[in-house]
Amino acid sequence: MRKRLRDTRMKVEEMSIGVRSNTVLQLLYIEDLVHQELLQAIKDRLEEFEIDGILYSGMLEQLTEEAWYSPFPQYQTTERPDRAAQELLNGKVVVICDNTPYALILPSSFNGFMESSEDWYHHFEMASFLRILRYLALMTAVLLPGLYLAVIRFHTQILPTNLLLSFAEAREGVPFSSVVELVFLELSFELIREAGVRVPGSLGNAIGIVGGLIIGQAAVSANLVSPIVVMIVALTALGGMVIPNEEFASAFRLLKYVFLFLGGYLGIFGIVLGIYLTAAHLSGLLSFGIPYLLPFVKKSPIKDVGDGILRLPFRKRRIRPLYARQEQSLRLKRREKS
C-alpha cells in the first residue's frame, strides 16, 4: 500500500482483538479524506464484542455486521492492493486482519460489489458496457427462473402462439410440474458447483463442465426435464458467475429460489412483490451509517449515479463520493498556467 500511496497523511492504526488469539488488526485510512465519525464508528464496532479469538476476517465480518440477519454482505473484500488504494482515495477505511490474505473495505455499497478492479484498466466505453452487462446478468440470475414459471403457469397469453406450442411440445412426457422440474435441475447444478469447489485443481473445473453436460443431457433424455429448463438454468448460472464479488453473488443465489417460488405460485404479482420487498430491505441497510444503495438514493449528485451504472471518463470524475470529507471533495482539476 505504501508503494501505491506515498502520502504522509495515510495512517495505519494497529489494534488487538481476541482475548486468547490477540489477533492484530490494521486500520488504513487517509487522514484528511475519511470522516472522523465513520472512523470512530468502525473502531467502536470492532471493540464492541469480547471474544476468545478471531482467526480470520470472515469471523470479524459476521460478528460486526449491523444487519446480521441479511444475506447481503456489508463488508467488501479484496486481495488487490490497487483496489484497496483506490478505495482509500475515495475516503473509505481498509481493515487488514492478521493471517488473512484479503482486506476488508468499509463502508460498502451495492454499487461497489458490482464494480470490478479491471474496470479502471479499460477505456470508459468498454468498462461502461461491462457494468451494464453485469446488471443485466444480475437480473437474469435472480429473476429468470421465476419469470419463466410465472409466464408458463399463469400468463401464457403474453407468449406468441408458436412459442407457446414449442414449450408445450418440449414438456410433453415430463411427469413433474414445471416448479418441481426447475427446482430439481437448479439443485443438481448447485451440487455440481459445490463438488467442483471441493475437488482440487483442474479436475474441479472438469467436473463442473462435464457433470453439467451429462446430467442435463441425461435428464432430458429420460424425460425428467424439458430442454428449455436446461437452457434457463444454464443462463441463470452464467448470470451469477458474471457478478464480480462471490459473497454478493451468493446472496442472490439464495434470493433466486425465493423468486422461483413466488413466480411459480403467485405469477407476475409474486415477482413484483419480491422485487418490492428486496428493494425495501436493501433501502433499509446501512454500512456504518452509509446507505447501502448509495449513490442511487439520498441526495447523490447525478454524476455519482451515472458513475455507478457507467464508468465515467477519468477527467469527468472530479468530485469524491458523498462519504468522503467534503472539505476535500475535489480530486481532479486543471493546473493553472503560469
Question: Where are the language model's segments positioned?
Answer:
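Cytosolic regulatory modules rich in charged/polar residues
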Residues: R2-E181, F288-K316, Y323-K337
